[in-house]
Amino acid sequence: MITIVGSGRVGTAAAAIMGIMRIDKKILLIDIVKGLPQGEALDLNHMSAILGLDVEYEGSNDYKDMAGSDLVIVTAGFPRKPGMTREQLVETNAKIVSDIGKEIKKYAPDSVVILTTNPLDAMTYVMWKSTGFPRERVIGFSGVLDAGRLAYYAAKKLGISPASILPIVLGQHGESMFPVPSKSFVHGVPLSKLLSEDQLREVVEETVKAGAKITELRGFSSNWGPGAGLAIMADSVKRDARRSLIASVVLKGEYGVFDLPVEVPIVLGKTGVVKVLEIELTPEEKEKFNQSVEAIRKLVGTIPQSYLQ
């Protein structure tokens, strides 16, 4: 069973796409708002019937119903508003994530946890601390979305399908994220060889600002992109597909970083992170990566200690 904590736009989009992909036969939605997860589950069950899917959705306001879940996806949290930075969300969402982490530890102690709550890397740290789980089972969703956006904007410049691009984005999920064109390939040819410096600069800028642009245009943050990315990650866990993808995970010496969640390439399977993939960076790329790491470290340092226990 998959449990999704948070029945807002991202959680329900993820639930719908997971059902369409037939990733699991039962998907539980949990939310603190009475009636919300139940209503979303009923609507999704109607969708399932119309599409002929063998998927059952259930809604609940009680964390104990997640018992038996092998995958818990956390999308709950205070939403990002227009003009708001991820950093402004820290204290409010740290409490939410810490509380949810304790419930997961109690009712689904063997689960793999994937979360989307912003600021993503800092909240991954809170979840890691509050659950006490090994780092392999606490994964921040970010890189699949960031890499997808990089592929989308680069493909538009090149006039090719985004599926032809193998994108790499490192560092922080946020304003200091670090797309790496020299390690992002189109059938073995790096983007840095296919695009001019001006084009690369535009692609990187569009990738970094994509989330804020969506929020500015429609008044609330993205949900379909994150929903699709979560479904891809869930599929890799549930089927033990061992896909290589980008995610925020606590590093234990990789890239010279210790005990800090950073967006890096990983292999994802049924036990969570199977392997962290280290790619060789140029001195300039390493400097940018380190700057992004320091931005994460600074943000983590602002988290109240009471939420890290």
Curated annotation (Swiss-Prot):
Binding locations of substrate: 80, 86, 118, 149
InterPro entries for this protein: L-lactate/malate_DH, Lactate/malate_DH_C, Lactate/malate_DH_N, Lactate_DH/Glyco_Ohase_4_C, Malate_DH_type3, NAD(P)-bd_dom_sf
CDD domains: LDH-like_MDH (cd01339)
Record bears the keyword Methyltransferase: no
UniProt binding sites for NAD(+): 6-11, 31, 93, 116-118
Record-annotated active site: 173 (proton acceptor)
One GO MF term attached to the UniProt entry: L-lactate dehydrogenase activity
Keywords noted in UniProt: NAD, Oxidoreductase, Tricarboxylic acid cycle
Protein's GO biological process: lactate metabolic process; tricarboxylic acid cycle
Catalytically driven reaction(s): (S)-malate + NAD(+) = oxaloacetate + NADH + H(+)
Listed EC numbers: 1.1.1.37
Sequence similarity: Belongs to the LDH/MDH superfamily.
Role summary: Catalyzes the reversible oxidation of malate to oxaloacetate.
Protein name per UniProt: Malate dehydrogenase
Organism from which the protein derives: Pyrobaculum calidifontis (strain DSM 21063 / JCM 11548 / VA1)
Upper taxonomic lineage: Archaea, Thermoproteota, Thermoprotei, Thermoproteales, Thermoproteaceae
